[in-house]
């Protein structure tokens, strides 16, 4: 495919000491923990060779399973791949957390675009030095299901697909909200993050049944 040309975005320099320590792709890039995310990146790149895999939802059954941490680490690793342009979207609009984890301050985000108060270009931030781009969540909202299900989100996804090779979508918990299912149906693939020793097997099974099999990339076991 032809190389994608990106517009100029606001840039933010990431400082390792300000980010969430579990973002090992940033804080411990040479550790064995980070190696697990390299393996996950390899899995995604390998799958991409045989099927369209551009927009990927990272979801969990319940809150606090590590899906946002997994999404950022994966996106950071993809962005460091030669020639790959990657965007991560915070679509967990009831509790947006990606900007806080990364130690960045944002004024606009996905909720503002959905509300029609800013453009996609104005809300995306380029994170140096990894070349990862982020579309933060913006202001927390309660009418998320309606916004995510509407035509505006489809437009946003179409627009960012034209700009980036990979779009990683941090979704709300699947076991609680319907938004994640809507997101998965608009994406090309999904992975489920499960916290070891915490998530009930029955809950995971129930959630997996709600994900179309052809979109399921696998289950990520979070040991932290």
Task: Annotate each predicted stretch with a short phrase.
Residues 1-224:
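P-loop NTP-binding module
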């Amino acid at each position: 495919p032809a190389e994608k040309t990106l517009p100029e975005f606001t840039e933010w320099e990431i400082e390792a000491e300000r980010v969430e320590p579990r973002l090992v792709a940033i804080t411990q890039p040479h550790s064995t923990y980070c190696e697990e995310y390299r393996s996950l990146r390899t899995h995604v790149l390998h799958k991409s060779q045989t099927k369209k895999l551009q927009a990927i939802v990272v979801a969990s059954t319940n809150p606090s399973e590590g899906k946002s941490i997994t999404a950022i680490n994966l996106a950071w690793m993809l962005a460091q791949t030669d020639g790959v342009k990657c965007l991560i979207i915070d679509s967990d609009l009831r509790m947006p957390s990606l900007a806080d984890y990364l130690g960045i301050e944002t004024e606009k985000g996905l909720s503002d675009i959905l509300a029609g108060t800013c453009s996609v270009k104005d809300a995306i931030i380029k994170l140096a030095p990894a070349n990862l781009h982020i579309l933060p969540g913006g202001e927390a909202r309660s009418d998320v299901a309606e916004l995510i299900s509407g035509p505006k989100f489809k437009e946003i996804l179409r627009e960012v697909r034209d700009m980036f090779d990979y779009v990683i979508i941090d979704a709300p918990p699947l076991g609680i909200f319907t938004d994640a299912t809507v997101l998965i149906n608009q994406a090309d693939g999904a992975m489920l993050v499960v916290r070891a020793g915490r998530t009930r097997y029955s809950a995971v099974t129930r959630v997996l049944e709600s994900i179309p099999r052809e979109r399921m990339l696998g289950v990520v076991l979070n040991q932290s």
